[in-house]
């Protein structure tokens, strides 16, 4: 058993909580990250390889058996890590149903025809491009896609020995200290956390616009030790 039991939120009736619920940011809809679908499963092979290699380099000789990718998007990094390691479980968590369903279908060996609307088309002819999504090979058993809020990941504490957060910390819209505390809860003894991507915090609260050094200090305050950081240039959504 790795899934935590679902319990009603404390502090009020369901009707009250629904009335007071926080709305999603206006830019967060089902197609907000559709470019990631095409990057992951069509034209972004080199970019995806660099991301997987960066995470693998951070792991060194470690051989995680239970991997959690929070904010997995369309799932290519989770797929690549699962294929590269001998993990018995890799859980790819994202709350976007389009990304989860496409990732599941393609990772299982399916092909999906889908029209891409590029973020910055170079000509009228490239404003809508027919693509075919597919994985290099079907995934081996153990890769699971879970549609859930990363701040409420439905797993028992201590389930994983590796948590990966790709391009997540500075876009999740929550204080970094809270995100890191939740990550730490999900890690078992001697577990590892690897963040891949930017740390360009630019939220409305100036106190949360952390530098890399401040992020490391925040992580240490939330129980992480032996922190190491490296920086490099990598392409991002470079179609």
Give each language-model segment a name.
Residues 74-87:
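Conserved SAM-binding loop of SAM-dependent methyltransferases across substrates and taxa
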Residues 161-174:
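A short SAM/SAH-binding and catalytic strip from SAM-dependent methyltransferases
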Residues 107-152:
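S-adenosyl-L-methionine
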Residues 190-199:
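Conserved beta-strand signature within the Rossmann-like core of class I S-adenosyl-L-methionine
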Residues 177-189:
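A short glycine-rich, Lys/Arg-flanked "PGG" loop and its adjoining helix->strand segment in the class I
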Residues 63-73, 91:
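Conserved class I S-adenosyl-L-methionine
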């Amino acid at each position: 058993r790795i899934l935590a039991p679902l319990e009603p939120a404390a502090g009020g009736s369901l009707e009250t909580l629904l009335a007071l619920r926080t709305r999603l940011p206006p830019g967060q809809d089902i197609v907000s990250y559709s470019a990631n679908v095409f990057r992951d499963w069509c034209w972004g092979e080199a970019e995806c390889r660099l991301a997987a290699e960066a995470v693998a380099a951070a792991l060194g000789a470690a051989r995680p058996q239970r991997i959690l990718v929070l904010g997995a998007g369309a799932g290519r990094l989770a797929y690549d890590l699962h294929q590269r390691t001998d993990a018995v479980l890799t859980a790819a968590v994202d709350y976007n149903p389009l990304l989860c369903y496409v990732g599941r279908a393609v990772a299982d060996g399916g092909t999906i025809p889908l029209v891409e609307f590029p973020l910055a088309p170079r000509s009228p002819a490239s404003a809508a491009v027919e693509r075919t999504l597919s994985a290099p090979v079907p995934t081996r058993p153990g890769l699971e896609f879970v549609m859930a809020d990363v701040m409420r990941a439905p797993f028992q504490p201590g389930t994983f020995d590796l948590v990966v957060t790709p391009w997540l910390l500075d876009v999740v819209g929550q204080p970094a200290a809270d995100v890191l505390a939740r990550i730490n809860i999900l890690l078992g003894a001697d577990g590892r956390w690897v963040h891949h991507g930017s740390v360009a915090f630019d939220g409305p609260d100036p106190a949360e616009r952390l530098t890399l050094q401040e992020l490391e200090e925040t992580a240490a305050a939330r129980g992480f030790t032996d922190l190491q950081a490296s920086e490099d240039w990598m392409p991002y959504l470079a179609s």
